[in-house]
Amino acid sequence: MTPSATKPLVSEAPKGIIDPSTGRPILSDDPFYKEINAELADKGFLVTTVDDLITWARTGSLMWMTFGLACCAVEMMQVSMPRYDVERFGFAPRASPRQSDVMIVAGTLTNKMAPALRKVYDQMPEPRYVISMGSCANGGGYYHYSYAVVRGCDRVVPVDIYVPGCPPTAEALLYGVLLLQRKIRRTGTIER
């Protein structure tokens, strides 16, 4: 019998996600990856629902548009720069509300600007999310008692994540983005 005749014609069953340098399963101590590795080793493929797949894709490709009204917009620009690079988390800027999933309201919202904010929000496709950034957007901030200031953008549009601070740091906004992704993963698409 030749050596080639003793080899099976079918490849071996996969053993999960294997690190080629060590030969061990990747993150074998993580419960999430243990479940994935066990399913891969058992069946050779993964089974999921379409809703889980859509939620996974949505959290990894959030397109945001700015509604920068004051000094918080500077920190919002900072989060896109190389030091923080929010795009590595799948959070990329867009100029048009029709291409955006997330609106970041940063700064003091006045009564005259409120209809414009609502109009831009209505142009965004569903599902749409709003991050309120800074004390002025959250509750009026320093100008809370002014006759011309809306006391929080949540009186005009529904807000999903509040980022506190005056102005909040870029790290705080980045944390707010990660919280939004966690919220999307938790709630899915149907409940929203």
From Swiss-Prot:
Gene3D superfamilies: 3.40.50.12280. Keywords: 4Fe-4S, Cell inner membrane, Cell membrane, Iron, Iron-sulfur, Membrane, Metal-binding, NAD, Quinone, Translocase, Transport, Ubiquinone. It comes from the Bacteria. Its main location: membrane. It is a peripheral membrane protein. GO terms for biological process: aerobic respiration; electron transport coupled proton transport. Its EC number is 7.1.1.-. The keyword Chaperone does not apply. It is an enzyme of class 7 (translocase). Its cofactor is [4Fe-4S] cluster. It catalyses: a quinone + NADH + 5 H(+)(in) = a quinol + NAD(+) + 4 H(+)(out). Binds 1 [4Fe-4S] cluster. [4Fe-4S] cluster binds at C71, C72, C136, C166. Signal peptide: none annotated. GO terms for molecular function: 4 iron, 4 sulfur cluster binding; iron ion binding; NADH dehydrogenase (ubiquinone) activity; NADH:ubiquinone reductase (non-electrogenic) activity; quinone binding. It is found in: Cell inner membrane. GO terms for cellular component: plasma membrane; respiratory chain complex I. NDH-1 shuttles electrons from NADH, via FMN and iron-sulfur (Fe-S) centers, to quinones in the respiratory chain. Couples the redox reaction to proton translocation (for every two electrons transferred, four hydrogen ions are translocated across the cytoplasmic membrane), and thus conserves the redox energy in a proton gradient. NDH-1 is composed of 14 different subunits. Subunits NuoB, C, D, E, F, and G constitute the peripheral sector of the complex. NCBIfam families: nuoB_fam, PRK06411.1. Belongs to the complex I 20 kDa subunit family. This is NADH-quinone oxidoreductase subunit B.
